[in-house]
């Protein structure tokens, strides 16, 4: 196992599978290549956390000198014609250790050019990538058709060969090289195995990525400006937004037809989602169709109004046809058993973690760590309530007085104060993020999911929008408990994602691919977990109740690690899990629900979402 599970809460270490805030970060076949086995190195001052080379986006990046005669991308293309099909550690060892300064600088220039080329490739296939980077995009909606995936696969293979041919890099450029190789190789394997085209999931599979582009523009223009020119500009932008919305609606039938074709192709190759996931996405497609029945703003131009109505009807029909296709064509072929199996799960884990892990070893670690966390919770309960208390009794005690809770309308004020206090304690004293980062902003999103996420600044230097912590309440959630929320706010803001992911997004030392598109979810969440511990050390969790909340969040994540590994790698159900009310010796939905309910302090609405 490349990364010791016991080190996953440390800075830069790979996070448990459950900690991934978006399950969309990046075996077998000729494209397989071993993940590098390395020891942590530091690219910053000694007091900074170590940086793991297998996740170089965590590093401190420096401008590359262009002294000497740089290699052109054409030079690298020529060298790639004799390059092997995959990078290996043996090849890395065989590379010459004698490098002149001009060779090193030239390698850095070429690698940055190749990283920029990869960013452009991703933007050409995904409008969300284009929006995040500010780079030009070529797709109205994400392209998951067989032709689109084949085109991307071919381009990624070419890029991988050319990156592998750059063999004179050192320092941060060598980290960039290895980072590009790992992400490219993992993506190539994922597409080749049919997993990209066969991906159906509840939260971040291709269907959701397509559907997210269909959000409605504002119902009226922003007429806040008092000047006539300002009003005219606002109305023009508003009309442009509705025109773009029309274009996306018109593109939906082709996008869903392409996705349906890829799902069929992947199913033939054995990459098919469990029946439960097929049914969930079919329901989401029906919901998408029903949401399209709202009326259009009255003051749109008449021609655009008619075009939108026609596009809306076509989009509704396409969504319903896609739902019907899933029910009638894919559902009969989908396995009823939950999970994808050990071989496929290994590929998914590498995509999300950026390295390979041993399922049994990680399963054993999670079991031991869960027991340790419960013991710490019980100890805090005894300190607060006295002998005989445990985590469950303290949880009931802390929730017994609703006057200690926050109302939803008060959440953002409190959470912003927590984030601002953390900024004052951390920035300039412990961490030095880029000058353009700025303080994070906390917002309350639409109710429904009951989750919280971080959205990085958009635009170089964060000029267009600051980093945002967005909290969504679960359906029916009326109270928010500060002792439980503090650790989450710190995880998402400071010293968590805002000074890690946000710092990447605003760093002028990194390429656009590194800033926005090359992150490894396991690395990002590894930092978030480390940030919670760091916040505790810095006095940002001042009460025993706050520390109990941090342990409760960790317990929840560890329980999800057990579930993820147990369900997808099909590992044995532990005795203590099988003994829980409603559980059995099989990793089915009843057993999963029993585990999550036993180890969680979240609402029933959030539990159902999970």
Region spans (language model):
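Short linear/disordered segments characteristic of secreted peptide precursors
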Residues: 13, 40, 48, 58, ...
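N-terminal acidic, proline/glycine-rich, low-complexity intrinsically disordered segments
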Residues: 1-24, 64, 71-73
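Compositionally biased, low-complexity flexible segments
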Residues: 26-36, 83-84
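N-terminal maturation segment of proteins
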Residues: 2-5, 80-83, 87-89, 93-610
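Short hydrophobic alpha-helical segments enriched in small aliphatic residues
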Residues: 22-25, 78, 88
């Amino acid at each position: 196992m490349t990364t010791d599970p016991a080190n996953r809460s440390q800075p830069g270490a790979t996070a448990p599978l459950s900690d991934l805030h978006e399950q969309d970060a990046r075996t077998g076949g000729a494209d397989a290549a071993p993940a590098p086995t390395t020891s942590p190195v530091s690219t910053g001052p000694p007091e900074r956390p170590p940086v793991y080379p297998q996740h170089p986006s965590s590093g401190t990046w420096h401008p590359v000198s262009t002294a000497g005669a740089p290699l052109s991308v054409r030079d690298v293309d020529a060298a790639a014609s004799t390059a092997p099909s995959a990078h290996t550690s043996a090849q890395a060892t065989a590379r010459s250790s004698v490098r002149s300064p001009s060779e090193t600088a030239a390698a850095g220039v070429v690698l940055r050019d190749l990283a920029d080329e990869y960013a452009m490739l991703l933007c050409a296939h995904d409008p969300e990538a284009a929006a995040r980077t500010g780079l030009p995009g070529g797709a109205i909606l994400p392209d998951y058709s067989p032709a689109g995936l084949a085109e991307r696969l071919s381009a990624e293979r070419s890029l991988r060969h050319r990156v592998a041919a750059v063999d004179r890099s050192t320092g941060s450029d060598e980290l960039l090289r290895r980072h590009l190789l790992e992400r490219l190789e993992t993506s190539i394997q994922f597409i080749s195995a049919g997993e990209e085209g066969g991906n159906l999931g509840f939260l971040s599979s291709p269907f959701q990525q397509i559907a997210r582009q269909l959000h409605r523009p504002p119902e009226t223009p922003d007429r806040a400006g008092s000047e006539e020119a300002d009003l005219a500009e606002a109305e023009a932008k508003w009309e442009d937004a509705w025109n773009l919305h029309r274009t996306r609606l018109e593109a939906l039938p082709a996008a869903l037809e392409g996705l349906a074709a890829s799902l069929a192709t992947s199913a033939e190759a054995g990459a098919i989602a469990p029946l439960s996931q097929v049914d969930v996405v079919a329901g989401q497609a029906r919901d998408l169709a029903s949401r399209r029945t709202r009326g259009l703003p009255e003051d749109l131009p008449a021609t655009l109004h008619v075009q939108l109505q026609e596009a809306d009807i076509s989009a509704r029909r396409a969504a319903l046809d896609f739902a019907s296709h899933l029910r009638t064509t894919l559902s009969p072929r989908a396995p009823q058993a939950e999970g994808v199996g050990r071989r496929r799960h290994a590929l998914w884990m590498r995509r999300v973690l950026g390295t390979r892990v041993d399922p049994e070893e990680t399963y054993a670690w999670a079991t031991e760590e869960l027991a340790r966390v419960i013991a710490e919770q019980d100890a805090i309960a005894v300190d607060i309530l006295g002998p005989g208390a445990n985590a469950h009794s303290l949880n009931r005690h802390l929730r017994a007085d609703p006057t200690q809770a926050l109302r939803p309308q008060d959440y953002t004020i409190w959470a912003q104060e927590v984030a601002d206090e953390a900024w004052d304690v951390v920035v300039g004293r412990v961490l030095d993020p880029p000058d353009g980062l700025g303080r994070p902003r906390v917002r309350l999103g639409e109710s429904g999911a009951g989750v919280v996420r971080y959205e990085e600044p958009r635009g170089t230097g964060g000029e267009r929008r600051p980093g945002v912590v967005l909290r969504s309440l679960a359906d029916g959630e009326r109270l928010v408990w500060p002792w439980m929320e503090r650790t989450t706010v710190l995880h998402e803001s400071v010293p968590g994602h805002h000074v890690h992911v946000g710092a990447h997004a605003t760093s002028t030392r990194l390429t656009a691919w590194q800033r926005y598109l090359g992150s490894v979810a396991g690395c990002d969440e590894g930092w978030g977990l480390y940030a919670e511990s760091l916040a505790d050390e810095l006095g940002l969790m001042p009460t025993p109740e706050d520390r109990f909340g941090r342990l409760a969040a960790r317990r929840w994540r560890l329980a999800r690690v057990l579930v993820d590994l147990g369900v997808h790698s099909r590992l044995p159900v532990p005795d203590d899990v099988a003994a829980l009310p409603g559980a059995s010796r099989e990793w089915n939905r009843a057993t999963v629900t029993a585990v999550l309910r036993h180890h969680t302090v979240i609402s029933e609405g959030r539990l159902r979402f999970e």
